[in-house]
Protein backbone atom coordinates (compact mmCIF):
# COMPACT_ATOMS: atom_id res chain seq x y z
CA UNK A 1 0.00 0.00 0.00
CA UNK A 2 1.17 3.52 -0.79
CA UNK A 3 -0.23 7.01 -0.31
CA UNK A 4 0.22 8.26 -3.85
CA UNK A 5 -0.49 11.98 -4.20
CA UNK A 6 -3.56 11.89 -1.98
CA UNK A 7 -4.81 8.40 -2.84
CA UNK A 8 -4.24 5.18 -0.91
CA UNK A 9 -3.41 2.60 -3.57
CA UNK A 10 -2.25 -0.98 -3.73
CA UNK A 11 1.22 -1.68 -5.09
CA UNK A 12 2.12 -4.35 -7.63
CA UNK A 13 5.67 -5.38 -8.46
CA UNK A 14 6.13 -5.64 -12.22
CA UNK A 15 8.73 -6.61 -14.79
CA UNK A 16 7.69 -5.32 -18.20
CA UNK A 17 10.73 -6.33 -20.29
CA UNK A 18 11.13 -10.10 -20.46
CA UNK A 19 12.56 -12.56 -22.99
CA UNK A 20 12.06 -16.30 -23.34
CA UNK A 21 12.95 -19.14 -25.68
CA UNK A 22 10.42 -17.67 -28.09
CA UNK A 23 13.32 -15.38 -29.07
CA UNK A 24 16.78 -15.30 -27.47
CA UNK A 25 16.04 -16.03 -23.80
CA UNK A 26 17.30 -19.05 -21.85
CA UNK A 27 14.01 -19.85 -20.14
CA UNK A 28 10.72 -21.01 -21.62
CA UNK A 29 7.76 -18.69 -21.03
CA UNK A 30 6.48 -20.97 -18.27
CA UNK A 31 9.90 -21.17 -16.62
CA UNK A 32 10.46 -17.43 -16.59
CA UNK A 33 6.98 -16.85 -15.18
CA UNK A 34 7.63 -19.26 -12.32
CA UNK A 35 10.95 -17.60 -11.52
CA UNK A 36 9.29 -14.21 -11.13
CA UNK A 37 6.28 -15.58 -9.28
CA UNK A 38 8.56 -17.29 -6.75
CA UNK A 39 10.32 -13.94 -6.24
CA UNK A 40 7.02 -12.23 -5.37
CA UNK A 41 6.20 -10.37 -8.58
CA UNK A 42 2.59 -9.49 -9.40
CA UNK A 43 2.63 -8.35 -13.04
CA UNK A 44 4.63 -9.56 -16.04
CA UNK A 45 4.90 -8.66 -19.70
CA UNK A 46 6.76 -11.06 -22.01
CA UNK A 47 8.38 -8.99 -24.75
CA UNK A 48 10.27 -11.32 -27.04
CA UNK A 49 12.09 -9.92 -30.06
CA UNK A 50 9.78 -9.54 -33.06
CA UNK A 51 7.40 -12.24 -31.77
CA UNK A 52 4.42 -12.21 -29.44
CA UNK A 53 3.49 -15.17 -27.26
CA UNK A 54 0.14 -16.88 -27.01
CA UNK A 55 -0.76 -15.72 -23.50
CA UNK A 56 -3.52 -18.30 -23.06
CA UNK A 57 -0.93 -21.09 -23.34
CA UNK A 58 1.32 -19.74 -20.56
CA UNK A 59 0.81 -20.51 -16.88
CA UNK A 60 0.86 -17.08 -15.14
CA UNK A 61 1.62 -18.69 -11.75
CA UNK A 62 -0.79 -16.33 -10.03
CA UNK A 63 0.47 -13.16 -11.72
CA UNK A 64 -1.18 -10.85 -14.23
CA UNK A 65 0.39 -11.57 -17.62
CA UNK A 66 0.29 -8.92 -20.34
CA UNK A 67 1.04 -9.54 -24.01
CA UNK A 68 3.99 -7.65 -25.46
CA UNK A 69 6.84 -7.60 -27.96
CA UNK A 70 10.15 -5.80 -28.51
CA UNK A 71 10.58 -4.38 -32.00
CA UNK A 72 13.67 -2.98 -33.71
CA UNK A 73 12.78 -0.58 -36.51
CA UNK A 74 15.47 1.28 -38.39
CA UNK A 75 16.20 4.82 -37.31
CA UNK A 76 19.24 4.95 -35.06
CA UNK A 77 22.56 6.63 -35.86
CA UNK A 78 24.61 3.91 -34.17
CA UNK A 79 22.28 0.94 -33.82
CA UNK A 80 18.70 0.03 -34.52
CA UNK A 81 16.10 1.18 -32.04
CA UNK A 82 14.55 -1.01 -29.38
CA UNK A 83 10.88 -0.25 -28.74
CA UNK A 84 9.10 -1.99 -25.87
CA UNK A 85 5.50 -2.61 -26.92
CA UNK A 86 3.19 -3.40 -23.99
CA UNK A 87 -0.38 -4.71 -24.32
CA UNK A 88 -0.46 -5.46 -28.02
CA UNK A 89 -2.57 -8.22 -29.65
CA UNK A 90 -0.99 -11.59 -30.35
CA UNK A 91 -1.33 -10.97 -34.10
CA UNK A 92 0.20 -7.49 -33.87
CA UNK A 93 3.58 -8.14 -35.53
CA UNK A 94 3.52 -7.91 -39.33
CA UNK A 95 6.18 -9.18 -41.72
CA UNK A 96 7.39 -5.62 -42.18
CA UNK A 97 7.73 -5.12 -38.42
CA UNK A 98 9.68 -8.36 -38.04
CA UNK A 99 12.05 -7.67 -40.94
CA UNK A 100 15.67 -6.68 -40.37
CA UNK A 101 16.03 -2.87 -40.44
CA UNK A 102 17.45 -1.29 -43.57
CA UNK A 103 20.29 1.19 -42.89
CA UNK A 104 19.32 4.75 -43.70
CA UNK A 105 15.60 4.19 -43.23
CA UNK A 106 13.54 5.30 -40.23
CA UNK A 107 10.37 3.49 -39.24
CA UNK A 108 10.31 4.23 -35.52
CA UNK A 109 7.33 6.58 -35.63
CA UNK A 110 5.34 4.04 -37.63
CA UNK A 111 5.81 1.48 -34.86
CA UNK A 112 4.87 3.93 -32.10
CA UNK A 113 1.73 4.89 -34.02
CA UNK A 114 0.79 1.25 -34.60
CA UNK A 115 1.19 0.38 -30.92
CA UNK A 116 -0.99 3.29 -29.85
CA UNK A 117 -3.61 2.44 -32.48
CA UNK A 118 -3.76 -1.10 -31.08
CA UNK A 119 -4.38 0.18 -27.54
CA UNK A 120 -0.87 -0.51 -26.33
CA UNK A 121 1.93 1.51 -24.76
CA UNK A 122 5.31 2.04 -26.41
CA UNK A 123 8.37 2.67 -24.22
CA UNK A 124 11.84 3.45 -25.55
CA UNK A 125 14.06 0.67 -24.21
CA UNK A 126 17.58 1.34 -22.88
CA UNK A 127 18.23 4.46 -25.02
CA UNK A 128 21.76 4.95 -23.64
CA UNK A 129 22.71 1.39 -24.58
CA UNK A 130 21.32 2.00 -28.09
CA UNK A 131 23.33 5.21 -28.45
CA UNK A 132 20.33 7.51 -28.79
CA UNK A 133 20.45 11.17 -27.83
CA UNK A 134 17.61 12.83 -25.99
CA UNK A 135 16.61 14.92 -29.01
CA UNK A 136 16.27 11.75 -31.10
CA UNK A 137 13.96 10.19 -28.53
CA UNK A 138 12.02 13.46 -28.19
CA UNK A 139 11.36 13.47 -31.93
CA UNK A 140 9.08 10.46 -31.52
CA UNK A 141 5.47 11.39 -30.78
CA UNK A 142 3.26 9.18 -28.64
CA UNK A 143 5.84 7.38 -26.53
CA UNK A 144 4.57 6.25 -23.13
CA UNK A 145 8.01 6.75 -21.56
CA UNK A 146 11.51 5.29 -21.40
CA UNK A 147 13.52 2.88 -19.29
CA UNK A 148 15.52 4.56 -16.53
CA UNK A 149 17.28 1.31 -15.62
CA UNK A 150 17.88 -1.93 -17.52
CA UNK A 151 19.55 -4.79 -15.66
CA UNK A 152 20.88 -6.67 -18.69
CA UNK A 153 22.87 -3.66 -19.96
CA UNK A 154 24.79 -3.06 -16.72
CA UNK A 155 27.71 -5.22 -17.85
CA UNK A 156 28.80 -2.62 -20.40
CA UNK A 157 28.19 0.40 -18.18
CA UNK A 158 25.02 1.62 -19.90
CA UNK A 159 22.30 0.48 -17.52
CA UNK A 160 21.21 3.93 -16.27
CA UNK A 161 19.37 6.57 -18.26
CA UNK A 162 18.87 9.34 -15.67
CA UNK A 163 20.58 12.14 -17.59
CA UNK A 164 18.69 11.42 -20.80
CA UNK A 165 15.45 11.25 -18.78
CA UNK A 166 16.15 14.65 -17.24
CA UNK A 167 16.92 16.14 -20.64
CA UNK A 168 13.57 14.88 -21.95
CA UNK A 169 11.75 16.32 -18.94
CA UNK A 170 13.58 19.61 -19.47
CA UNK A 171 12.07 19.65 -22.96
CA UNK A 172 8.63 19.52 -21.34
CA UNK A 173 7.97 15.86 -22.08
CA UNK A 174 5.96 14.21 -19.33
CA UNK A 175 7.81 10.91 -19.51
CA UNK A 176 7.55 8.35 -16.72
CA UNK A 177 10.34 5.78 -16.63
CA UNK A 178 10.48 2.04 -16.03
CA UNK A 179 13.11 -0.07 -14.31
CA UNK A 180 13.30 -3.49 -15.95
CA UNK A 181 15.39 -6.64 -16.09
CA UNK A 182 15.32 -7.26 -19.86
CA UNK A 183 15.97 -10.80 -18.70
CA UNK A 184 17.70 -13.23 -21.04
CA UNK A 185 19.79 -15.25 -18.57
CA UNK A 186 20.04 -15.87 -14.83
CA UNK A 187 22.37 -12.91 -14.27
CA UNK A 188 19.60 -10.56 -15.47
CA UNK A 189 17.04 -11.62 -12.86
CA UNK A 190 15.49 -9.29 -10.27
CA UNK A 191 17.76 -6.27 -10.67
CA UNK A 192 15.15 -3.58 -11.33
CA UNK A 193 11.38 -3.37 -11.39
CA UNK A 194 8.45 -0.99 -11.46
CA UNK A 195 5.90 -0.72 -8.66
CA UNK A 196 2.50 -0.03 -10.17
CA UNK A 197 0.18 1.95 -7.90
CA UNK A 198 -3.50 1.31 -8.56
CA UNK A 199 -6.70 0.09 -6.93
CA UNK A 200 -6.66 -3.49 -8.18
CA UNK A 201 -4.59 -5.87 -10.25
CA UNK A 202 -6.68 -5.98 -13.40
CA UNK A 203 -5.50 -5.28 -16.94
CA UNK A 204 -7.62 -2.13 -17.05
CA UNK A 205 -6.27 -0.69 -13.79
CA UNK A 206 -2.66 -1.66 -14.42
CA UNK A 207 -2.59 -0.22 -17.94
CA UNK A 208 -4.35 2.96 -16.83
CA UNK A 209 -1.73 3.39 -14.09
CA UNK A 210 1.10 2.94 -16.59
CA UNK A 211 -0.45 5.53 -18.90
CA UNK A 212 -0.85 7.99 -16.03
CA UNK A 213 2.63 7.43 -14.61
CA UNK A 214 1.08 6.03 -11.44
CA UNK A 215 4.11 3.95 -10.52
CA UNK A 216 7.66 4.28 -9.32
CA UNK A 217 10.74 2.29 -10.32
CA UNK A 218 13.35 0.75 -8.10
CA UNK A 219 16.26 -1.58 -7.54
CA UNK A 220 15.23 -2.10 -3.91
CA UNK A 221 14.20 1.03 -1.93
CA UNK A 222 10.46 1.53 -1.57
CA UNK A 223 8.40 4.70 -1.53
CA UNK A 224 5.63 4.68 1.09
CA UNK A 225 4.17 8.12 0.44
CA UNK A 226 4.43 10.80 -2.24
CA UNK A 227 2.70 14.16 -1.95
CA UNK A 228 2.67 17.55 -3.64
CA UNK A 229 0.38 20.19 -2.14
CA UNK A 230 0.63 23.98 -1.97
CA UNK A 231 4.12 23.94 -3.43
CA UNK A 232 5.44 21.40 -0.90
CA UNK A 233 6.82 18.07 -2.11
CA UNK A 234 6.97 15.32 0.51
CA UNK A 235 8.12 11.71 0.36
CA UNK A 236 8.38 8.85 2.83
CA UNK A 237 10.36 5.71 2.07
CA UNK A 238 12.34 2.79 3.44
CA UNK A 239 15.74 3.73 4.95
CA UNK A 240 18.23 5.12 2.42
CA UNK A 241 21.52 6.98 2.65
CA UNK A 242 20.64 9.64 0.08
CA UNK A 243 17.33 11.18 -0.99
CA UNK A 244 17.49 13.89 -3.63
CA UNK A 245 14.97 16.15 -5.34
CA UNK A 246 16.15 16.48 -8.94
CA UNK A 247 14.97 19.21 -11.31
CA UNK A 248 16.14 21.15 -14.35
CA UNK A 249 17.27 23.99 -12.11
CA UNK A 250 20.85 24.09 -10.84
CA UNK A 251 19.41 24.06 -7.33
CA UNK A 252 17.99 20.90 -5.78
CA UNK A 253 17.63 19.32 -2.39
CA UNK A 254 19.43 16.46 -0.64
CA UNK A 255 17.89 14.98 2.51
CA UNK A 256 21.00 13.02 3.47
CA UNK A 257 24.74 13.54 3.09
CA UNK A 258 27.94 11.52 3.61
CA UNK A 259 28.98 11.14 7.21
CA UNK A 260 31.06 14.23 7.99
CA UNK A 261 32.11 12.96 11.42
CA UNK A 262 34.08 10.07 9.95
CA UNK A 263 32.94 7.63 12.64
CA UNK A 264 32.21 4.85 10.15
CA UNK A 265 28.46 5.06 10.60
CA UNK A 266 26.22 5.43 7.57
CA UNK A 267 23.46 8.00 8.13
CA UNK A 268 20.01 7.05 6.94
CA UNK A 269 16.89 9.01 6.18
CA UNK A 270 13.26 7.91 5.71
CA UNK A 271 11.54 11.11 4.60
CA UNK A 272 12.01 14.50 3.00
CA UNK A 273 10.02 17.71 2.75
CA UNK A 274 10.86 20.38 0.21
CA UNK A 275 9.33 23.70 -0.80
CA UNK A 276 9.70 23.78 -4.59
CA UNK A 277 9.82 27.59 -4.58
CA UNK A 278 13.38 27.24 -3.29
CA UNK A 279 14.33 25.91 -6.72
CA UNK A 280 13.70 29.30 -8.26
CA UNK A 281 14.80 31.65 -5.48
CA UNK A 282 18.24 32.30 -7.01
CA UNK A 283 17.44 31.59 -10.64
CA UNK A 284 16.73 34.21 -13.30
CA UNK A 285 16.71 31.77 -16.21
CA UNK A 286 13.70 31.42 -18.45
CA UNK A 287 12.88 27.71 -18.55
CA UNK A 288 10.20 26.15 -20.71
CA UNK A 289 8.97 23.57 -18.24
CA UNK A 290 9.98 22.94 -14.65
CA UNK A 291 9.72 19.51 -13.06
CA UNK A 292 10.76 17.62 -9.96
CA UNK A 293 11.48 13.96 -9.34
CA UNK A 294 12.74 12.15 -6.25
CA UNK A 295 15.72 9.82 -6.41
CA UNK A 296 16.74 7.50 -3.56
CA UNK A 297 19.92 5.50 -3.00
CA UNK A 298 20.42 3.00 -0.20
CA UNK A 299 23.53 1.68 1.56
CA UNK A 300 23.86 -1.07 -1.07
CA UNK A 301 23.98 1.47 -3.88
CA UNK A 302 20.49 0.61 -5.13
CA UNK A 303 18.32 3.38 -6.57
CA UNK A 304 14.62 4.18 -6.62
CA UNK A 305 12.98 6.83 -8.79
CA UNK A 306 9.65 8.62 -8.56
CA UNK A 307 8.15 9.82 -11.80
CA UNK A 308 8.42 13.57 -12.44
CA UNK A 309 5.80 16.05 -11.38
CA UNK A 310 5.53 19.30 -13.31
CA UNK A 311 5.43 22.42 -11.20
CA UNK A 312 2.57 24.88 -11.78
CA UNK A 313 3.48 28.45 -12.70
CA UNK A 314 2.22 29.79 -9.37
CA UNK A 315 5.04 28.04 -7.47
CA UNK A 316 7.89 29.16 -9.70
CA UNK A 317 9.15 32.01 -7.60
Predicted regions and their residues:
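C-terminal functional module detector
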Residues: 1-7, 11, 171-176, 181-317
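A metal-dependent hydrolase metal-coordination microenvironment
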Residues: 2-121, 125, 132-135, 139-142, ...
Amino acid sequence: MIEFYGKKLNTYRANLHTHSTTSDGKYTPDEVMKLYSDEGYDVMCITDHRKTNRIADIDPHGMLLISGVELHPAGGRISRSHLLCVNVPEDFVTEEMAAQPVPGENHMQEIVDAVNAAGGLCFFAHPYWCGFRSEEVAALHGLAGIEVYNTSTRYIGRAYNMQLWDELCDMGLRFPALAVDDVHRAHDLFGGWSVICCEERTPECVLAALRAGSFYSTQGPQFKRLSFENGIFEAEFTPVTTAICVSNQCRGYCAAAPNKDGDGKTPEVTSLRFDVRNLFAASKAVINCDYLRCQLRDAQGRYAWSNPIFIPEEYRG
